[in-house]
Structure formats: structure tokens, C-alpha cells
């Protein structure tokens, strides 16, 4: 649950609202209806959807989803699961009353344990989940390229993927490119092009080695 919250929170704050929705959907479907955890994830999923509809200027959809999301979060403690539930409820109620408010203000950032997480704040494995979600969400990205980049990055990290180690090595190699891919929405296409070229070069070397034994 905590991992899904961190992954979805980081994706949402990076502006990838549909990817955040996907991060929460699978654990949400496994929960019993009406439990506190189910209501939290249901509310967050609908907050992401409301924000997406507001971005598309679908005011009626944004209004409906914001009202529903606020209702799901209404019975939860203000800081349930270390999330900024109270602030999100307030934002949702304002969005439900005036969905065009979204044009005048950026979506309220989600916070987990007091921090507005971005992909740069995640462990490598959590970051890899975000990158995978993005590759599945956007047609411009080849999921097999991202999958191989993650595999190569794990090889760079070895057995230690703790956050301090990832932070120290993040600017280099496949690890750095994956962090940039997940964390740089506006320049993501450029980062992906660089990532795909590096992946293809590594694949080519692998094919050359395999050919030695044929």
C-alpha cells in the first residue's frame, strides 16, 4: 500500500495523472469495498481523473468526479496514511463547485509523509514502476525499450538499490536516464530518444556476443 501511494503520488505530482490512476487501480481493486484504504485509493483515483478532465476542459466530468472523490475521502482522518487528505478534500470541493477554477490554479500537489514527492524522490524500484506506467500510457514510448533500460539499470546498481545509492549515481548511465524520463514531463520525448539510442547500442552489443557462439 505504501509503495503504491508513493508511486502514484510521484506520478501525479509530475503531471502524469492517468499513470497515477493506474498505479492505484490494482491495489484498490484488491481491497474490500468501504474500508478506509479502499476509500482513500478510490478518492485518489477519482481526484486524478477529475484533474485529467479539467485539463481537457471537460467541466461536467471534472465536477462530477471531484464531488465523488471528496465524498470518498470525507470519512477519513485528515492525515490518513500520511497523505494530505484534508487539503485534498478542500481542493476537491472547490473544484466541484467551480471546475473552471482548474484553469486559474495548478492541481493541488499530493503529499506523502509531509513531502510532495516527485519521481526523483523514489527508490529505484519505485521509479522503475513509474517508468513502466508511462511507457504503457503513452503511445510515443516503446515499452520494450523501457523494460530493457530498467534491466540494464539494475545491472548498473548491482544488489543495492537503496535511495542513497540511487541518488549518488542518478546522473549517470541508464539509472540517470530513467530518472530523467520519469521526472521531466516537458522534455520527456527528448530524454526518451536518448534512452532508446543507448538501449539499441546495448542490444547490438548483446547480439554481437550471442553471435560468437552460433
What label would you give each PLM region?
Residues 1-214:
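Acidic, polar-rich N-terminal leader regions of halophilic archaeal proteins
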Amino acid at each position: 500500500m505504501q509503495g503504491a501511494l508513493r508511486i502514484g503520488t510521484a506520478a501525479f505530482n509530475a503531471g502524469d495523472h492517468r499513470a497515477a490512476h493506474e498505479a492505484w487501480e490494482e491495489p484498490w481493486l484488491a481491497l474490500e469495498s468501504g474500508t478506509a484504504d479502499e476509500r482513500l485509493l478510490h478518492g485518489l483515483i477519482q481526484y486524478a481523473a477529475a484533474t485529467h478532465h479539467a485539463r481537457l476542459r471537460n467541466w461536467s466530468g471534472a465536477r462530477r468526479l471531484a464531488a465523488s472523490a471528496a465524498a470518498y475521502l470525507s470519512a477519513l482522518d485528515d492525515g490518513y496514511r500520511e497523505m494530505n487528505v484534508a487539503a485534498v478534500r478542500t481542493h476537491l470541493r472547490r473544484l466541484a463547485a467551480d471546475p473552471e477554477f482548474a484553469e486559474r490554479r495548478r492541481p493541488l500537489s499530493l503529499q506523502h509523509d509531509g513531502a510532495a514527492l516527485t519521481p526523483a524522490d523514489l527508490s529505484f524500484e519505485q521509479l522503475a514502476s513509474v517508468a513502466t506506467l508511462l511507457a504503457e500510457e503513452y503511445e510515443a514510448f516503446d515499452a520494450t525499450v523501457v523494460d530493457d533500460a530498467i534491466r540494464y539499470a539494475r545491472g548498473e546498481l548491482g544488489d543495492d538499490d537503496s535511495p542513497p545509492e540511487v541518488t549518488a549515481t542518478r546522473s549517470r548511465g541508464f539509472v540517470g536516464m530513467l530518472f530523467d524520463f520519469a521526472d521531466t514531463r516537458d522534455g520527456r520525448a527528448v530524454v526518451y530518444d536518448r534512452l532508446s539510442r543507448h538501449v539499441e547500442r546495448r542490444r547490438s552489443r548483446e547480439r554481437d556476443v550471442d553471435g560468437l557462439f552460433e
